Design a protein with these regions (language model features):
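Short, polar/flexible loop-turn hinges at active-site or ligand-entry regions and domain interfaces
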Residues: 1-8, 38-42, 61-65, 87, ...
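Residue-level signature of catalytic and energy-coupling elements of molecular machines
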Residues: 21, 95, 165
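Coupling/switch/interface segments within P-loop NTPase motor domains and analogous charged loops
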Residues: 1-60
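Conserved coupling/interface region of RecA-like P-loop/ASCE motor cores
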Residues: 127-185
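Generic alpha-helical structural context detector
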Residues: 22, 74, 109, 167-174
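Proline-centered turn/helix-capping motifs that create local helix->coil transitions or kinks
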Residues: 25-33, 116, 172-184
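Charged, alpha-helix-enriched surfaces in structured cytosolic catalytic cores
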Residues: 12, 16, 48, 67, ...
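Conserved helicase NTPase motor core
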Residues: 42-142, 157-161
Length: 185
């Protein structure tokens, strides 16, 4: 029915706006960033609607003293930038590093920069699956630009699959020009 279609479209639009806000915040932007974009962008009608919804979303969170996941990461990073009494960080381990967002990496980098902690990051660019939630494979692929004295250890042996299956999947994965070159055994 027409009513069901309208409800379905509303739910889809709501999800789209929520995804936009999440991706925007995950990439270290805030309302002021969006205001600047709206001000400087010629076709600003949709962005203005999103900005208004963003304001309402933030107001609702503030009125209920709520935080979303991205807020927690951003606030933790700000606290670590202000307070220097966290010298007890010696090591940071990040698993599934290929699925790290900019704000999550900034949190780890703040600790590393202020404590000299050693980062161990484990990941596989061929297994990156969270781009839809703001994770950025660029961070994984360019970690050497952000971490001094980076040492890379490649694990090339797997015992999960036959060599035939490994070769078939590697042939498929290696067709992607953005993947790291790798050979598996």
């Amino acid at each position: 029915t027409k009513l069901d279609k309208g409800k379905s479209e509303y739910i889809s639009f709501k999800k789209l706006i929520k995804t936009f806000i999440n991706l925007f915040k995950t990439n270290n932007h805030d309302i002021d960033s969006l205001k600047n974009i709206v001000k400087n962008y010629q076709d600003k009608y949709l962005l203005k609607i999103i900005l208004d919804i963003f304001y309402l979303y933030e107001e609702e969170k503030n009125s209920t003293s709520s935080l979303d996941f991205d807020d927690l990461i951003i606030i933790a990073t700000k606290i670590l930038n202000i307070k220097y009494n966290y010298k007890y960080f010696k090591y940071i381990i990040i698993d599934e590093f290929q699925d790290t967002s900019l704000i999550r990496f900034n949190l780890a980098k703040t600790i590393i920069d202020n404590t000299g902690a050693i980062l161990t990051a484990v990941g596989d660019d061929a297994q990156s699956i969270y781009h839809f939630s703001g994770c950025d494979l660029f961070i994984f692929l360019n970690l050497h630009k952000y971490i001094n004295n980076l040492k890379e250890l490649k694990l090339v042996n797997t015992y999960r699959f036959s060599q035939e299956l490994i070769d078939i999947s590697a042939n498929f994965i290696n067709k992607n020009p953005f993947q790291l070159d790798k050979s598996m055994h």
